[in-house]
Amino acid sequence: MLTRKQQELLLFIHERMKESGVPPSFDEMKDALDLASKSGIHRLITALEERGFIRRLPNRARALEVIKLPEAYSPSIQPRRGFSPSVIEGSLGKPQPVATPAPAKSVADNGNSVSVPVMGRIAAGVPISAIQNNTHDIVVPADMLGSGEHYALEVKGDSMIDAGIFDGDTVIIRNGSTASPGDIVVALVDDEEATLKRFRRKGASIALEAANPAYETRIFGPDRVKVQGKLVGLIRRYH
């Protein structure tokens, strides 16, 4: 799944190459997506490359190759300059912060179990968009939760495996906007991408740290990261 900005950039590159045979410059991509700096374009290109949508050609300036497009892409819809995407894969639109869930509800007479809404998926790997629909509810032990509002997310990726969090697990999150160093959090980056990582501080910056040596720690300015909740529990199904 691509975020809206990733889709916008992919389609902009594709349409420009169809028109002129040459990929757009980083400045052109920045202006087309209305981003403040070229660093945002670098991040989007890296994400598209990691997902297999584009390839950077070595030893050539501005050399990008579009490998594939979103399945629902319609070539009859042409982008305009400045440009909104013709396709939103999965019809997500622009991702928003994780919606505030309803309080957990008791589902047993003795109050030992509660129902928690599953709000979608969260990346433990390359950041993806958190899906904003309450897809279904799950029942968890009441003593797993404590106080506060909670929601669940299904994990996609392997960047937190050394913390015991695996692809396909369901994590239970206590809703909140603050975290202490070392907490595993749902972090929203640039109001665009959601990811599950360990929260650290590096001076005035925020570090989102993976629990897998294959992934680098990502450093952001404090205004670029919003904490959406902290990990309080995990559910795993064995097949």
Swiss-Prot record:
Keywords: Autocatalytic cleavage, DNA damage, DNA repair, DNA replication, DNA-binding, Hydrolase, Repressor, SOS response, Transcription, Transcription regulation
GO biological process: DNA repair; DNA replication; negative regulation of DNA-templated transcription; proteolysis; SOS response
Region (Disordered): 84-107
Entry annotated with the keyword DNA-binding: yes
DNA-binding residue intervals: 26-46
Keyword Secreted: no
EC number: 3.4.21.88
Catalytic reactions on record: Hydrolysis of Ala-|-Gly bond in repressor LexA
Catalytic residues as annotated in Swiss-Prot or TrEMBL: S159, K197
Pfam family, one: LexA_DNA_bind
Site feature location: Cleavage: A124, G125
GO MF term list: DNA binding; serine-type endopeptidase activity
Subunit structure: Homodimer.
Family affiliation: Belongs to the peptidase S24 family.
Function (record text): Represses a number of genes involved in the response to DNA damage (SOS response), including recA and lexA. In the presence of single-stranded DNA, RecA interacts with LexA causing an autocatalytic cleavage which disrupts the DNA-binding part of LexA, leading to derepression of the SOS regulon and eventually DNA repair.
Protein name: LexA repressor
Lineage: Bacteria, Pseudomonadati, Pseudomonadota, Alphaproteobacteria, Hyphomicrobiales
